[in-house]
Amino acid sequence: MGKYVLRRLLMTILVVLVASVVVFTLVYFVPGDPVKILMSPESTVAELEAKRHSLGLDRPYLVQLGNFLYNAYIKFDLGTSWIRGTSVVEGLAERLPYTFQLGVLAILVSSLIGIPLGINAAVHQNCWQDRVCMLIGMVCTSVPDFWIALLMIVLFSQKLNWLPAFGVGGITYLIMPVIAASLKSIGTLARQTRSSMLEVIRSDYVTTARAKGLKERSVIYKHMLPNALIPIITVIGGSFSGIIAGTVVIEQVFSRPGVGTYLTQAITNRDFPIIRGCVIILAIFTSVMMLLVDLAYAVVDPRIKAQYAGQSRKRSHKHGGNPHHRHHHHHDHGGHDHHDHCEESEKGERKDG
């Protein structure tokens, strides 16, 4: 498994390097002269040329790219803001905690709401509970986060005066941003959890667990959910990365001093060092999240851990009976109509009670 982690780390470094080259190239070839934005309109040609030389913008593309990569990955220096005159690394260090605070809380809320919604929908497939849960998920996915953010500001801050609208502080400053940032992930997790649970709900080991007289809650959370976790973990990892990237909008709406606001202001001012630094940080974060997701697979599925350890597939299958072999079991049991499943769910609930 150590070799796999090392291989993935090397791949992560390669991805980040490619992302760095791409963002540098895009910024380099953006039309317009950033020096004219930095200098006053009355500046002479000589002053503009002097400023361009001091920033290194008069050097060839490959020279600038090489200097940027060397400074970023050898000296860990992302440069100095052209507008603020401060270190980009220091600016990111000040703002990253606010962004991660928002992202972590949002993915926790998404998981605590979205996964139970999906489970409830799956165990009551085609019943009214299923329809209600999926309707909630569809609404969460469909509503734009910036629109719900503005709506909450108007309602809870301006009209009712319950919550502060802008800035940072105590927990009350986080309630509306976290809700706005987590809505899409709630819907996505609910749908994925339902789909994953339906893949295992009619598996042989689930039928056996019920035949042993286990309570329905035990069957769901000890036998179904663990075997449905792989796709759910994938969605959680992707949602977390999406939430962090989506803070560009949320932080602007709620005036939070995070990376999103930092990046937006840099784009407005054409402050290229900040733009490049923010994109690199987001690329590193996304790549690390994907690595953590892959490692989480090994925690919930012993077969994957065995593969990471270099064991052959034949040896992995030799110890059969693993309930994780659960793909598409439900397709082999087509004799159950919708009403029967609703009745089964109701019986299971009565038994659980």
Predicted regions located by residue number:
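N-terminal signal-anchor/signal peptide hydrophobic helix marking the start
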Residues: 6-16
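Membrane-water interface segments at the C-terminal ends of transmembrane alpha-helices
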Residues: 22-23, 27-29, 68, 72, ...
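Hydrophobic alpha-helical transmembrane segments of membrane transport/permease proteins
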Residues: 15-66, 160-176
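Hydrophobic alpha-helical segments of integral membrane proteins
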Residues: 9, 51, 55-73, 77, ...
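Residue-level signal for discrete positions within transmembrane alpha-helices
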Residues: 12, 95, 99, 135-142, ...
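An internal, D/E-rich "acidic patch" concept
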Residues: 58-115
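Alpha-helical transmembrane segments of integral membrane proteins
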Residues: 2-3, 94-129, 168-314
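Histidine-centered metal-binding segments
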Residues: 313-353
